[in-house]
Amino acid sequence: MLRIKYPKFLNCIKYIPKGSDICIIEAIESLAYGNSESKYLSTMLEQNGNDYKKLINIIIEKYDLQVIVKNNKYVTNYEDDDTKEGKKKKAIKDIMVENYLIRMKVEKGLSISQIKKILFKINLRLFLKMLPLKNILIEDGEIISILDPIIDDLD
């Protein structure tokens, strides 16, 4: 599982105008996970006093995103919509599971090895389609509970 190295880039997302295309968000997520430009842009962000709007414009220029303003919304042209949407969904799922496990670790006082076992069980059962999505309770974008006796078994 990837770890977020530069969480300050995720603060940029709230400054992206509503209706913006997903590729801007994907570029910011890529920076948060740490690509080749992350350190440079992170330093530049600190020097500019955390001006996130300016950083978004720099990201649009740097990644050559073709942004056209129409009706106060940004529209970006790119190919492979389905592939990028699938990657976005997987990234969101991974983050939701990671947040759930962090909360479980704090609430139940679990060890790292127990967390790794639970993560393995969740991913395996999702991959093999043995864990129905109706058994995953989600509220406000967070996993509240996973109803599965195999995952609940901490041994």
From Swiss-Prot:
It comes from the Viruses. Belongs to the IIV-6 145L family. This is Uncharacterized protein 145L.
